[in-house]
């Protein structure tokens, strides 16, 4: 193009407000524009602004927009716009969406062979980098969708030795320990402990110590619970308990130096309860007290008082001298008066708490005495020791022997919990189920291995029953509420005991309790048996109760018996005799029977006692085996106004002699029959001797009669004289016979004379009887002995038997010593 033309074509700078030249317009020189100049004038301009907003002078330079025709071969993709509050997360999401759009655009163009593979590889690398960043940061790193995160975790879990898997397990361990510690309390501590042992507490002991200290500092009322938890774990894993104690002492020292009263109070409270649980030695408690009381200030006194209230009972039992020294120091500080009135009042309250024996601050609360003192391991860590708090245990660190350490802890866990589930993986399905059953059977006793020796459940049950009874308006409401109480199987007797104890505590008997017992007895057989068992127990121990309690208990059981709540067969435990009863038991039986008579009447009670089926149960109350016991029982029941029930025993006493005689006869017959069966020869010989004795006695009676007849008629037969000559004595002189025969009548009947003699002297003394033989009024005794000289040497005291010789059947042995010569001689066997 000519230079002149180019100079004329190049336009001057113009303002944007100027309108472009029209195609048919011409220059001032009268020449038209060339076609090369048309595109320069074919651009779109922005609308003209308001004339008032136009600048005073046009711009010196013009900015021309990039022509779209020059970059028509590049694909233009708009950057996605993501709305998110977090700028880092918004940027990451925008990059991800942009990458996705680029891949889709390249796939549409057909260039997927090289570019797409490179893009996918970079995406995986980015994801892994984000996952590594997630594991290495506290905040969690960039956002990863849950599904993608689970996929990455599953991929990392394939290699258990990798740092990623160890970090995942570390995070899970930390969350589990925190969750279990945050939800522990008195009621569920027995279930939390096995779950804690299920986690690797050796690897996570730092996490456990940090978590339990944080939880205790944020909730001081639960300090005894956390101390009991640490005490249980300390019995199996002492290094865990020692680490907690070391960190607590270190934290107390730092807080004391910083004058942080809140942290000092929380930490000292935890240490006090660890001392109560025998995890920490009492030396550290005494050191803390002496440190706080050495240079007393208001804050140190407040910490010391709070610490002493928690550990005072423990020190009074285990270190009484040191405890007295501490209280003497408290008294000295109080008398010095250098502290505020508030702290002085706190010390006075502490002395009152000590006087009350720490009833509101027990060393170990109810339900937390879960460890035997012999099993506990006590750590002697003091304030002056060099402590290793091991803060590195709170942070994650890859373990090159991770798998081996996990297996070791699994062995420890099986030893603690009795769990054996590692061998079930290589067995069949049936064997696997059997092994699970065996595991359950093995684990169950271990869970119950932490025995509660304080009977907390029993105490809570009794408290519930007592409050339920006291809060009821009538017996029906009480029974309805008590039936809803969850009473363990085999503990039904506790409800009966509580009802009876509540009844005994009243000033006077209330029928409210009797109706409760009656309703329970009629609801189910279990309660009937329980109240019958309670009757036997209270009868055996009734001597322990006061008179008022005894009366209430007796009336309660009297109501149950009268209403047929319990069987009358329970009275078999009553033995009414002097040896087996006491004054308390007799009073108890009296009150029971009087209550029964008051409700039923004496007639019905007496009829009930006569029921044949129940008589064996009443054998002890109405004894008929011994007159002494029967007499005692009759006197007892008569004295209490129940003589009507003793009629059978009175009849027994009347017939007792006859019964005793019959019993003795039967006993003698039994003994004789036993002796008769010894030998047949003894029986025959004894029968022969008895027959000989009987024959001799009969012959003697006949001979004595004939002698009397002969003496009266003065003409004895020759046989009679022959028998007399056969006797040991010589023949009697006739003078003796004449003297004895003259006073008698010539021919009296022998029988009549004998009766007349008997009638004259029915019971004469010995001398009168001797005179009666001669019929003389006063015969000299010496003459009579002279007449009796026909016998060789008759002893004087034997002569009284001569008068008995006239009887029809005198004893055989005494016939030999009769003074009458006319008496026959004894049989030869008796000689």
UniProtKB/Swiss-Prot annotation:
Q: Which gene encodes it?
A: CWC22
Query: Which SMART domains has this protein been placed in?
Result: MA3, MIF4G
- Residues forming the MI domain are 460-576
Q: Name one GO biological process term.
A: mRNA splicing, via spliceosome
Q: What segment(s) does the record annotate as region Disordered? A: 1-89, 414-450, 670-831
Q: What is this protein called?
A: Pre-mRNA-splicing factor CWC22
Cysteine disulfide links: none
Q: Where in the cell is it found?
A: Cytoplasm; Nucleus
Q: InterPro entries of this UniProt entry?
A: ARM-type_fold, CWC22_splicing_factor, Initiation_fac_eIF4g_MI, MIF4G-like_typ-3
Q: Enumerate the spans annotated as MIF4G domain.
A: 174-357
Please describe the quaternary structure of this protein. Answer: Associated with the spliceosome.
Low complexity bias spans:
1-17
Please classify the protein's predominant subcellular localization into one broad category: cytoplasm
Report which superkingdom the organism of origin falls in: Eukaryota
**PANTHER family associated with the record:** CELL CYCLE CONTROL PROTEIN CWF22-RELATED, PRE-MRNA-SPLICING FACTOR CWC22 HOMOLOG
Gene Ontology CC, one term: catalytic step 2 spliceosome
Q: Which Gene3D superfamilies match?
A: 1.25.40.180
